[in-house]
Amino acid sequence: MENTQKTVTVPTGPLGYVYACRVEDLDLEEISFLAARSTDSDLALLPLMRNLTVEKTFTSSLAVVSGARTTGLAGAGITLKLTTSHFYPSVFVFHGGKHVLPSSAAPNLTRACNAARERFGFSRCQGPPVDGAVETTGAEICTRLGLEPENTILYLVVTALFKEAVFMCNVFLHYGGLDIVHINHGDVIRIPLFPVQLFMPDVNRLVPDPFNTHHRSIGEGFVYPTPFYNTGLCHLIHDCVIAPMAVALRVRNVTAVARGAAHLAFDENHEGAVLPPDITYTYFQSSSSGTTTARGARRNDVNSTSKPSPSGGFERRLASIMAADTALHAEVIFNTGIYEETPTDIKEWPMFIGMEGTLPRLNALGSYTARVAGVIGAMVFSPNSALYLTEVEDSGMTEAKDGGPGPSFNRFYQFAGPHLAANPQTDRDGHVLSSQSTGSSNTEFSVDYLALICGFGAPLLARLLFYLERCDAGAFTGGHGDALKYVTGTFDSEIPCSLCEKHTRPVCAHTTVHRLRQRMPRFGQATRQPIGVFGTMNSQYSDCDPLGNYAPYLILRKPGDQTEAAKATMQDTYRATLERLFIDLEQERLLDRGAPCSSEGLSSVIVDHPTFRRILDTLRARIEQTTTQFMKVLVETRDYKIREGLSEATHSMALTFDPYSGAFCPITNFLVKRTHLAVVQDLALSQCHCVFYGQQVEGRNFRNQFQPVLRRRFVDLFNGGFISTRSITVTLSEGPVSAPNPTLGQDAPAGRTFDGDLARVSVEVIRDIRVKNRVVFSGNCTNLSEAARARLVGLASAYQRQEKRVDMLHGALGFLLKQFHGLLFPRGMPPNSKSPNPQWFWTLLQRNQMPADKLTHEEITTIAAVKRFTEEYAAINFINLPPTCIGELAQFYMANLILKYCDHSQYLINTLTSIITGARRPRDPSSVLHWIRKDVTSAADIETQAKALLEKTENLPELWTTAFTSTHLVRAAMNQRPMVVLGISISKYHGAAGNNRVFQAGNWSGLNGGKNVCPLFTFDRTRRFIIACPRGGFICPVTGPSSGNRETTLSDQVRGIIVSGGAMVQLAIYATVVRAVGARAQHMAFDDWLSLTDDEFLARDLEELHDQIIQTLETPWTVEGALEAVKILDEKTTAGDGETPTNLAFNFDSCEPSHDTTSNVLNISGSNISGSTVPGLKRPPEDDELFDLSGIPIKHGNITMEMI
């Protein structure tokens, strides 16, 4: 735990409120963009936001009145029991939800959820959760408040700790304590909720029969209230909160989960098991009878060090339920936390600033939800996503290093098992129970799987479809079916669908899944994989520069030195030095720190050849000077071990556990909770074998006896490198506590003479999880097993630096050459072409096929400067990424210089890439089918209405789809405090010799699924990707495939064409795309070309080529016509290639900055050329020496390696 303990003062209050709002006082259009609601239900979820669903002064963290205790000699006095908590980030609309627009037009989602629930064997919410319940309807509440039921919306705002208590009817409405608050346009009535335990002194447990008015625990003289039970509200909490948790915990008895969580809320001292012993488990053939390979695949290897589990799956099932029980306890720890972050205020969102009118605000909101769809889709499309971790596997007993059996942290693990959910169920001993469910070998993704991961909640499923309907950009994986053709072609045929009719088929959930079927995950054998997690950056601090936390503050500061200010030490860190370099470049007008990924500002600086070369000289001088000074300070002043520090450097970032940072909508909050449950169970499962080791696990009392042991081992993992917590001392606001007077009942005003007593004064608050990635690959094979050594050898080949000639356009200055080609080389275009073409120009140059008379003296000088800069950079480069802007070039150049000073050699370093989600208007009719709202009567109507939607997108704020861009300036991307998706694998290990504490590391890993997850993903072991949806500048202010296989995709083909080069790369790419995509290529725009090429300038050229072909076609665009146009353009640009040149060819290989242009040409028509020489091929003179450095003086910087 942290040494510094913070004190926080919180107010006291009820466990929740019921808000009663008039419909006209709410911004229903904006609310609908953020809500979760299906078409067949009036129940809805809304985000907890100030000035949207709660008042501006809403207090999110408080001490909840959770019960009462008797005081005094005779027990006549009452002291209120107070428990810390924070409000749940979603609110529950249980009356009037019909006024909120559905999230998706997909019909009959409740039917789909019920069918999936029955198929997978999960319990339903049938009737009241307790006996003798008396319902309080929404209409009754409205009548009591003097409001019109038809014109009123009622929703519940409840604390995270007591939401299950509301479901179990252990609360009552205190009408005497209602008050009026102001939200948005009008006044809103809110009714506080208190627990019935307030009328049962000293009862610290869940009340199983709250409607029993003669309960013996009711205090003498107390007027017992009517507990609050509402059918719709209970269904909403059951389906959207408890059932998703039950799916993640592998517990099919959903009510048992609710009962256990509610009990823990009232009994803070309970440490034993809370889930019942009769839990059922999914039957499947465990692979622990075999052995575990390095990647987790099972094989029958007699030489393996793993042994089969002797218990026939009993220990696997025991580990599963004990890990689930531990996760419930962890949820209580999180729910009792006090967090400083408050719910966001929608009126303060930066993206709404300066906007007048409803349509612009809705357009901004629609655009941003399309951005969010990028990260939501990644969680759905990745097969190792936390959403799909529904089963536990046993990898078998692993022998210790001394040859004997020993406990292993890696024995039990979660894996993706939705395809197993329909299998029969077993009891704890493995006996198969009678069940209607049968397993199926079909692993094709279906709507049932979406319903499963949503906990069978129709509102969550509708909201998830809302995002999937916006996932369109970048699905260039081959075989992408045209959904429009599918719907129109099957309109008149009898296709059995339980969810839709003909006229609603375009918006059916099955149509959405069919459209995205190529991107949906496929599940198979149980293997250990990284966990795909969803989280939020709530801090602008991250170590995501190329060298991570190299030379950090904690190492540079001198222990015990009180004379030097901390700020002075900070200025000598790598992070601060890189920031100073960016400031210097900004002063030189080379960089805009507000938009470091953009190079548009260079257009005002680079106006001709001299300014271009001056930029290169300035850039090189600034970087070398800054790096030299930085290394000198580290060595001479800080006495920093530069080489050892490099081997210990890591990229790092923290994903917050703050409940409101990821609460943009109910689905983002849902994903945060699923991520928490996944990582908590991963840690708990790692300790199960240690608890089981040497014990008689078959005993009936084993679980109750050792559940507290597992819980304590889990809590001991806090602050061990992965989960960070902080101990907070809680104090109460001054004054008496306001609560209902038990002797007067629920209609009387609140009494204000009660004293309160906190159940826990010191609260452990879970803050964040830490993700790390080592910068340098060491290749050290010592102290490793044979399997690990073999895997490391395979990695070494991937990290091996390849010595090869650098293509200028793929080198350090490639982005500048593409951006300013038209300015620097206006004549650099193919014959019969009207626009300069950098690919054609530099291809001919590097093949020595460029006629010298086409180059001026200034152009030759610039070419020589570019060649020298590129080759000098390539000579020291250990980063397997070409820069795409000045900021990336600066940080890469500086990192390479530091690597040179540290004598780094042989291996490439690990690099980070951030995929930034964006938004665009749809252009393909197939991507707007789900927005057709008019009933269709024929197949022709579908296409007509789809095209009509595309013509009026500007007036339809919901018509946005996702797009992606990439940047290697990851720290700049993390400064926007984004919502992120990435893969992590949590390693566990003991400390130094004699230290039994278990430490962990959240290793930055990958998302399986490749380009199905994101079109910009590439298979490169040296790179780590993160998908980020920026929040800064939008909703918060900005201060200061399976792992072993890889499929060939269209993006791979395009990248292959780019790498192979060629004079007319654009034509080759365009033809390839048209052949692969077909008619969809007609609607492709800049975002699509960028997704394929990951090159902004090449994408712009392709967009222009696309427009040019459309204009030249005399008939409507067709695949055949486009390919014919490409062929004609190719013939025009290559015309004259067979002619024998009579002029001199420019010799690119021997070019150097020189005033004599004749030294850089080859005489290809003179007598020294043999008659068999093919015109245009490189034939250097015999006395030509490449890279003759004899006349170049050796430059010495201010510091050399000898000095170090």
From Swiss-Prot:
Disulfide bonds: none
Record GO biological process: bidirectional double-stranded viral DNA replication; DNA replication
Superkingdom in the source lineage: Viruses
A Pfam cross-reference name: Viral_DNA_bp
Region (Disordered): 289-314
Cellular location(s): Host nucleus
The protein's role, per its UniProt record: Plays several crucial roles in viral infection. Participates in the opening of the viral DNA origin to initiate replication by interacting with the origin-binding protein. May disrupt loops, hairpins and other secondary structures present on ssDNA to reduce and eliminate pausing of viral DNA polymerase at specific sites during elongation. Promotes viral DNA recombination by performing strand-transfer, characterized by the ability to transfer a DNA strand from a linear duplex to a complementary single-stranded DNA circle. Can also catalyze the renaturation of complementary single strands.
Quaternary assembly: Homooligomers. Forms double-helical filaments necessary for the formation of replication compartments within the host nucleus. Interacts with the origin-binding protein. Interacts with the helicase primase complex; this interaction stimulates primer synthesis activity of the helicase-primase complex. Interacts with the DNA polymerase. Interacts with the alkaline exonuclease; this interaction increases its nuclease processivity.
Protein name: Major DNA-binding protein
Organism this protein belongs to: Varicella-zoster virus (strain Dumas)
